[in-house]
Amino acid sequence: MDFQLQAVDDNARAGLLNLAHSQVATPVFMPVGTQGCIKSLDATDAQEILGAKLILANTYHMYLRPGEKVVGQLGGLHRFAQFQGSFLTDSGGFQAFSLSGNIKLQEDGIVFKSHIDGSKHLFTPAKVLDIQYSLNSDIMMVLDDLVGLPAPLKRLEESIKRSAKWANLSLEYHKQKNRPSNNLFAIIQGGTHLKMRSLSVGLTHEGFDGYAIGGLAVGESVDEMLETIAHTAPLLPKDKPRYLMGVGTPENILDAIGLGVDMFDCVMPTRNARNATLFTYSGKISIKNAPYKLDNTPIEENCACYTCKRYSKAYLHHLFRAKELTYARLASLHNLHFYLELVKNARNAILEKRFLSFKKEFLEKYNSRSH
C-alpha cells in the first residue's frame, strides 16, 4: 500500500491511499456494508451513484454467515458483492464484544457465542487474518480487546497490553504470508486515559500499513473523545493513514479531520436515514413530520444527489409513512451523498489551506436549525 500525504493545513491532512482495487482520496468516509453491502443499496448504488471507493464490511458477520470459505470460493468480497472498489474489514472484536453478551477473554483470543445460533467460536489474531485473507480485504484490522467506558485503570492497562500483543503477533503472521495486496492496520486502545493511549502506541510495533484509534464512541463524552484524539493522533507515524473507528456525526468528523485523522466509518448516515432523519447543510430534518406531507421541494435545494434530483420531501414522507422499502434506499443515498461530499469539501479546503474557515462556515450553518 502506498500513502501519499499531499497537503497539511494546521493539523488537517489531505492524501492519496493507493490500494489494490482503487485509489482513495483522503480524508475519506467509508460507508458501512456490514454484510457485504450497504443496507438497502447494491454495488451499482455504491460505485456509480455515490462514487464510493472504499467501504467497510465486517469479519464477524461474514464469518458466521455465509462463511469466509464460501466467499473465498466465490472469488472474494469484490466478486461476491460485485463491488469494484476496495473493502476494509473490521476484525470482529467489537461485534463479539457488543453482540455475544458473554464473551470470554483468553490470552490467545476471544471465545464468543454466535448471535445467530448460540454456537461457540474462538477468534485468535491469526484466525481473524485468515478469515480476512479469504475475503481478500484491501485493509484488514487486527484483533483487539475492546473496553466499554468508563472502565477501571487496571482493565484499561490489561486491554492495552493484550491488544498490543495481538497486534504484534498479527504483524509477524502477516509478514510470513507475503500478501502485499492485503494491508494490515493496528488499533490503538486506552479509553480516554491519555497515559494509557501513549502506552498503547509505545507497545505497538512499527511496520503496520496504517493505525486506527479504537475504543471511542463507546460511552465517553464528546469532549473526552476529542481530547483523546488530539493526544493520540500526533503520536502515530506521519507517513501512515490514521483511522478513527466508528465515528461519527458531521461535527465529530470535521473536528477529527482538524486533529489529523484521515479515515472514518459510521452507521449514522444509513441508520438515521432508515429512521426518518435526513442530513442537510442547515441541520437535520425528520421526514416523518407532518409539515412535509405537502412539501414539493427536495430534501435540500441544490443537492446533486440521486434522490434530490428526482423526488420531493412529500414523496419521501409518504414512502416512510407507508413503510415502503424504496424509502430506505432513497434516504440512504441522500445521507451518504451528504457525508461523502462533506469529506470531499473538507479535502479541497485542506488543499487550498482554508480548512478552519471551511469548518467554521459549515458548523455555523449546520447548527443554525434542526427540525
Curated annotation (Swiss-Prot):
Amino-acid positions noted as binding substrate in the UniProt annotation, renumbered to this chain = 90-94, 144, 189, 215
- Protein's GO biological process: queuosine biosynthetic process; tRNA-guanine transglycosylation
List the record's Gene Ontology CC terms alphabetically.
Answer: cytosol
What is the active site of this protein? 90, 265
- What positions does the entry give for Zn(2+) binding? 303, 305, 308, 334
Pathway annotation from the record: tRNA modification; tRNA-queuosine biosynthesis
Under which main EC class is this enzyme filed?
Answer: transferase
Question: InterPro entries per the record?
Answer: TGT, TGT-like_sf, tRNA_ribo_trans-like
> Can the keyword Metal-binding be found in this entry's annotation?
yes
Q: Which GO terms describe its molecular function?
A: metal ion binding; tRNA-guanosine(34) queuine transglycosylase activity
Record's Pfam families?
Answer: TGT
Region RNA binding: what ranges? 246-252, 270-274
EC numbers: 2.4.2.29
Q: Which reaction does it catalyse?
A: 7-aminomethyl-7-carbaguanine + guanosine(34) in tRNA = 7-aminomethyl-7-carbaguanosine(34) in tRNA + guanine
Q: Which key words are in the record?
A: Glycosyltransferase, Metal-binding, Queuosine biosynthesis, Transferase, tRNA processing, Zinc
Which co-factors does it depend on? Zn(2+)
Q: What does this chain do?
A: Catalyzes the base-exchange of a guanine (G) residue with the queuine precursor 7-aminomethyl-7-deazaguanine (PreQ1) at position 34 (anticodon wobble position) in tRNAs with GU(N) anticodons (tRNA-Asp, -Asn, -His and -Tyr). Catalysis occurs through a double-displacement mechanism. The nucleophile active site attacks the C1' of nucleotide 34 to detach the guanine base from the RNA, forming a covalent enzyme-RNA intermediate. The proton acceptor active site deprotonates the incoming PreQ1, allowing a nucleophilic attack on the C1' of the ribose to form the product.
NCBIfam families with a match to the protein in the record? Q_tRNA_tgt, tgt_general
Per UniProt, subunit arrangement is: Homodimer. Within each dimer, one monomer is responsible for RNA recognition and catalysis, while the other monomer binds to the replacement base PreQ1.
Instruction: Please state which protein family the record places this protein in.
Output: Belongs to the queuine tRNA-ribosyltransferase family.
Q: What is this protein called?
A: Queuine tRNA-ribosyltransferase
Gene behind the chain: tgt
